[in-house]
Protein backbone atom coordinates (compact mmCIF):
# COMPACT_ATOMS: atom_id res chain seq x y z
CA UNK A 1 0.00 0.00 0.00
CA UNK A 2 2.87 2.34 0.68
CA UNK A 3 4.15 1.88 -2.91
CA UNK A 4 0.87 2.78 -4.69
CA UNK A 5 0.23 6.09 -2.85
CA UNK A 6 3.05 8.25 -4.37
CA UNK A 7 2.23 7.23 -7.96
CA UNK A 8 -1.15 9.03 -8.01
CA UNK A 9 0.05 12.72 -7.71
CA UNK A 10 2.79 12.34 -10.37
CA UNK A 11 0.39 11.64 -13.26
CA UNK A 12 -1.68 14.92 -13.35
CA UNK A 13 1.41 17.19 -13.14
CA UNK A 14 2.28 17.22 -16.90
CA UNK A 15 -1.39 17.70 -17.80
CA UNK A 16 -1.43 21.08 -16.00
CA UNK A 17 1.56 22.52 -17.92
CA UNK A 18 0.30 21.89 -21.45
CA UNK A 19 -2.92 23.99 -21.37
CA UNK A 20 -0.98 27.05 -20.13
CA UNK A 21 1.23 27.08 -23.26
CA UNK A 22 -1.72 26.72 -25.60
CA UNK A 23 -3.53 29.64 -24.00
CA UNK A 24 -0.47 31.87 -24.33
CA UNK A 25 -0.16 31.04 -28.03
CA UNK A 26 -3.82 31.80 -28.66
CA UNK A 27 -3.60 35.15 -26.86
CA UNK A 28 -0.54 36.15 -28.95
CA UNK A 29 -2.28 35.20 -32.20
CA UNK A 30 -5.36 37.25 -31.36
CA UNK A 31 -3.25 40.28 -30.44
CA UNK A 32 -1.43 40.03 -33.79
CA UNK A 33 -4.73 39.88 -35.63
CA UNK A 34 -6.03 42.99 -33.85
CA UNK A 35 -2.93 45.00 -34.77
CA UNK A 36 -3.04 43.93 -38.41
CA UNK A 37 -6.73 44.68 -38.88
CA UNK A 38 -7.74 48.21 -40.00
CA UNK A 39 -5.78 51.32 -40.98
CA UNK A 40 -3.82 53.39 -38.41
CA UNK A 41 -5.54 55.98 -36.21
CA UNK A 42 -3.88 58.95 -37.95
CA UNK A 43 -5.46 58.04 -41.30
CA UNK A 44 -8.90 57.64 -39.74
CA UNK A 45 -8.61 61.03 -38.00
CA UNK A 46 -7.56 62.84 -41.20
CA UNK A 47 -10.43 61.28 -43.14
CA UNK A 48 -12.93 62.25 -40.45
CA UNK A 49 -11.67 65.86 -40.33
CA UNK A 50 -11.67 66.13 -44.14
CA UNK A 51 -15.24 64.81 -44.32
CA UNK A 52 -16.59 67.42 -41.87
CA UNK A 53 -17.92 70.70 -43.29
CA UNK A 54 -17.62 72.78 -40.12
CA UNK A 55 -15.64 76.00 -40.61
CA UNK A 56 -14.56 76.29 -36.98
CA UNK A 57 -13.15 72.74 -37.02
CA UNK A 58 -14.06 69.32 -35.66
CA UNK A 59 -14.21 68.81 -31.89
CA UNK A 60 -12.85 65.74 -30.11
CA UNK A 61 -16.39 64.49 -29.39
CA UNK A 62 -17.34 64.77 -33.07
CA UNK A 63 -14.16 62.93 -34.06
CA UNK A 64 -14.99 60.07 -31.70
CA UNK A 65 -18.49 59.80 -33.16
CA UNK A 66 -17.09 59.68 -36.70
CA UNK A 67 -14.53 57.05 -35.73
CA UNK A 68 -17.16 54.95 -33.94
CA UNK A 69 -19.36 55.13 -37.05
CA UNK A 70 -16.40 53.83 -39.11
CA UNK A 71 -16.19 50.78 -36.81
CA UNK A 72 -13.27 51.91 -34.65
CA UNK A 73 -13.36 51.06 -30.92
CA UNK A 74 -13.14 54.54 -29.39
CA UNK A 75 -13.38 53.52 -25.71
CA UNK A 76 -10.40 51.12 -25.81
CA UNK A 77 -8.28 53.34 -28.08
CA UNK A 78 -9.00 56.71 -26.46
CA UNK A 79 -5.32 57.29 -25.63
CA UNK A 80 -4.29 56.42 -29.19
CA UNK A 81 -6.74 58.98 -30.59
CA UNK A 82 -5.24 61.74 -28.44
CA UNK A 83 -1.67 60.77 -29.40
CA UNK A 84 -2.67 60.67 -33.06
CA UNK A 85 -4.14 64.18 -32.86
CA UNK A 86 -0.98 65.55 -31.22
CA UNK A 87 1.30 63.93 -33.81
CA UNK A 88 -0.79 65.25 -36.72
CA UNK A 89 -0.71 68.77 -35.26
CA UNK A 90 3.08 68.58 -34.78
CA UNK A 91 3.56 67.37 -38.37
CA UNK A 92 1.38 70.18 -39.70
CA UNK A 93 -1.35 68.08 -41.31
CA UNK A 94 -3.92 69.39 -38.79
CA UNK A 95 -4.38 72.85 -37.30
CA UNK A 96 -5.84 73.28 -33.79
CA UNK A 97 -8.39 76.10 -33.89
CA UNK A 98 -9.67 75.85 -30.30
CA UNK A 99 -8.43 74.46 -26.99
CA UNK A 100 -5.07 73.01 -26.05
CA UNK A 101 -3.71 69.51 -26.42
CA UNK A 102 -6.12 66.83 -27.60
CA UNK A 103 -9.18 68.63 -26.12
CA UNK A 104 -10.20 71.16 -28.75
CA UNK A 105 -11.30 71.50 -32.36
CA UNK A 106 -9.14 70.65 -35.37
CA UNK A 107 -9.04 71.47 -39.08
CA UNK A 108 -7.01 70.29 -42.04
CA UNK A 109 -4.01 72.44 -42.89
CA UNK A 110 -4.66 73.81 -46.39
CA UNK A 111 -0.96 74.52 -46.95
CA UNK A 112 -0.08 70.91 -46.16
CA UNK A 113 -2.85 69.68 -48.45
CA UNK A 114 -1.65 71.97 -51.26
CA UNK A 115 1.95 70.90 -50.56
CA UNK A 116 0.94 67.30 -51.14
CA UNK A 117 -0.48 68.30 -54.51
CA UNK A 118 2.65 70.23 -55.50
CA UNK A 119 4.96 67.21 -55.71
CA UNK A 120 2.59 65.77 -58.31
CA UNK A 121 3.00 68.94 -60.36
CA UNK A 122 6.77 68.62 -59.98
CA UNK A 123 6.62 65.06 -61.25
CA UNK A 124 4.66 66.26 -64.27
CA UNK A 125 7.25 68.98 -64.77
CA UNK A 126 10.02 66.42 -64.36
CA UNK A 127 8.59 64.56 -67.34
CA UNK A 128 9.31 67.61 -69.53
CA UNK A 129 13.10 67.51 -69.03
CA UNK A 130 13.07 64.22 -70.91
CA UNK A 131 13.08 66.29 -74.13
CA UNK A 132 16.47 67.80 -73.27
CA UNK A 133 17.67 64.21 -72.88
CA UNK A 134 16.80 63.76 -76.57
CA UNK A 135 18.50 67.07 -77.26
CA UNK A 136 21.58 65.71 -75.52
CA UNK A 137 21.74 63.05 -78.23
CA UNK A 138 22.13 65.76 -80.88
CA UNK A 139 25.54 66.85 -79.59
CA UNK A 140 26.65 63.27 -80.26
CA UNK A 141 26.03 63.95 -83.94
CA UNK A 142 28.12 67.10 -83.64
CA UNK A 143 30.86 65.04 -82.03
CA UNK A 144 30.63 62.67 -84.98
CA UNK A 145 30.93 65.66 -87.31
CA UNK A 146 34.18 66.49 -85.57
CA UNK A 147 35.74 63.32 -87.02
CA UNK A 148 36.02 64.83 -90.55
CA UNK A 149 38.31 67.44 -88.99
CA UNK A 150 40.80 64.68 -88.27
CA UNK A 151 40.72 63.60 -91.92
CA UNK A 152 41.22 67.23 -93.00
CA UNK A 153 44.26 67.48 -90.75
CA UNK A 154 45.76 64.31 -92.23
CA UNK A 155 45.45 65.48 -95.86
CA UNK A 156 47.55 68.65 -95.51
CA UNK A 157 50.32 66.59 -93.93
CA UNK A 158 50.45 64.42 -97.04
CA UNK A 159 50.45 67.50 -99.30
CA UNK A 160 53.21 69.25 -97.37
CA UNK A 161 55.70 66.36 -97.64
CA UNK A 162 55.73 66.14 -101.49
CA UNK A 163 55.66 69.93 -101.79
CA UNK A 164 58.84 70.33 -99.77
CA UNK A 165 60.60 67.49 -101.57
CA UNK A 166 59.63 68.84 -105.00
CA UNK A 167 60.64 72.36 -103.99
CA UNK A 168 64.10 71.24 -102.90
CA UNK A 169 64.63 69.25 -106.09
CA UNK A 170 63.60 72.20 -108.29
CA UNK A 171 65.90 74.56 -106.41
CA UNK A 172 68.80 72.11 -106.77
CA UNK A 173 68.21 71.70 -110.52
CA UNK A 174 67.94 75.45 -111.14
CA UNK A 175 71.14 76.08 -109.22
CA UNK A 176 73.01 73.54 -111.36
CA UNK A 177 71.70 75.06 -114.62
CA UNK A 178 72.76 78.56 -113.63
CA UNK A 179 76.31 77.53 -112.72
CA UNK A 180 77.18 75.51 -115.87
CA UNK A 181 76.38 77.94 -118.76
CA UNK A 182 78.51 80.84 -117.45
CA UNK A 183 81.98 79.25 -117.90
CA UNK A 184 81.10 77.90 -121.37
CA UNK A 185 80.26 81.37 -122.73
CA UNK A 186 83.47 82.81 -121.33
CA UNK A 187 85.54 80.08 -123.05
CA UNK A 188 83.98 80.61 -126.51
CA UNK A 189 84.50 84.39 -126.60
CA UNK A 190 88.32 84.33 -126.33
CA UNK A 191 88.53 81.66 -129.06
CA UNK A 192 86.72 83.91 -131.53
CA UNK A 193 89.03 86.86 -130.73
CA UNK A 194 92.19 84.81 -131.50
CA UNK A 195 91.00 83.60 -134.93
CA UNK A 196 91.12 86.97 -136.87
CA UNK A 197 94.79 87.64 -136.01
CA UNK A 198 96.26 85.07 -138.44
CA UNK A 199 93.98 86.37 -141.23
CA UNK A 200 95.59 89.85 -141.05
CA UNK A 201 99.07 88.33 -141.57
CA UNK A 202 98.30 87.13 -145.16
CA UNK A 203 98.90 90.52 -146.92
CA UNK A 204 102.52 90.41 -145.74
CA UNK A 205 103.14 87.34 -147.90
CA UNK A 206 102.06 89.22 -151.13
CA UNK A 207 104.86 91.82 -150.99
CA UNK A 208 107.69 89.47 -152.08
CA UNK A 209 105.86 88.78 -155.34
CA UNK A 210 106.45 92.42 -156.41
CA UNK A 211 110.23 92.11 -155.92
CA UNK A 212 110.39 89.15 -158.30
CA UNK A 213 109.04 91.26 -161.21
CA UNK A 214 111.80 93.85 -160.78
CA UNK A 215 114.51 91.21 -161.38
CA UNK A 216 113.32 90.54 -164.96
CA UNK A 217 114.33 94.02 -166.22
CA UNK A 218 117.96 93.22 -167.40
CA UNK A 219 116.76 91.43 -170.55
CA UNK A 220 117.12 94.72 -172.58
CA UNK A 221 120.87 94.07 -173.37
Curated annotation (Swiss-Prot):
Residue numbers of N6-acetyllysine PTMs: 17
Stretches the record annotates as Disordered: 1-43, 90-221
Ranges annotated as biased composition (Low complexity): 1-17, 180-193
Pfam families hit by this protein: Linker_histone
Phosphothreonine, modified sites: 18
InterPro entries found in the cross-reference section: H1/H5, Histone_H1/H5_H15, WH-like_DNA-bd_sf, WH_DNA-bd_sf
GO MF term set: chromatin DNA binding; double-stranded DNA binding; nucleosomal DNA binding; RNA binding; structural constituent of chromatin
Compositionally biased region (Basic residues): 20-36, 120-141, 150-161, 170-179, 194-221
BP GO terms, sorted: chromosome condensation; negative regulation of DNA recombination; negative regulation of transcription by RNA polymerase II; nucleosome assembly
GO cellular component: chromatin; euchromatin; nucleosome; nucleus
Post-translational modification note: H1 histones are progressively phosphorylated during the cell cycle, becoming maximally phosphorylated during late G2 phase and M phase, and being dephosphorylated sharply thereafter. Citrullination at Arg-55 (H1R54ci) by PADI4 takes place within the DNA-binding site of H1 and results in its displacement from chromatin and global chromatin decondensation, thereby promoting pluripotency and stem cell maintenance.
Top-level taxon of origin: Eukaryota
Residue numbers of Phosphoserine PTMs: 2, 105
Family annotation (CDD domains): H15 (cd00073)
Assigned keywords, A-Z: Acetylation, Chromosome, Citrullination, DNA-binding, Hydroxylation, Nucleus, Phosphoprotein
Function statement: Histone H1 protein binds to linker DNA between nucleosomes forming the macromolecular structure known as the chromatin fiber. Histones H1 are necessary for the condensation of nucleosome chains into higher-order structured fibers. Also acts as a regulator of individual gene transcription through chromatin remodeling, nucleosome spacing and DNA methylation.
Family according to the record: Belongs to the histone H1/H5 family.
Description of its domains: The C-terminal domain is required for high-affinity binding to chromatin.
Protein name (Swiss-Prot/TrEMBL): Histone H1.3
Organism, scientific name: Homo sapiens
Lineage, opening ranks: Eukaryota, Metazoa, Chordata, Craniata, Vertebrata
Amino acid sequence: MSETAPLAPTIPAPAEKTPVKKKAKKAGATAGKRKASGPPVSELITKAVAASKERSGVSLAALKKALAAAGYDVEKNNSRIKLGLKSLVSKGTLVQTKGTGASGSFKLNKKAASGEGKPKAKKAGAAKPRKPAGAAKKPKKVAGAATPKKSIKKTPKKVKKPATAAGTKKVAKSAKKVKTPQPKKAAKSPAKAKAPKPKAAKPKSGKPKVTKAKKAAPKKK
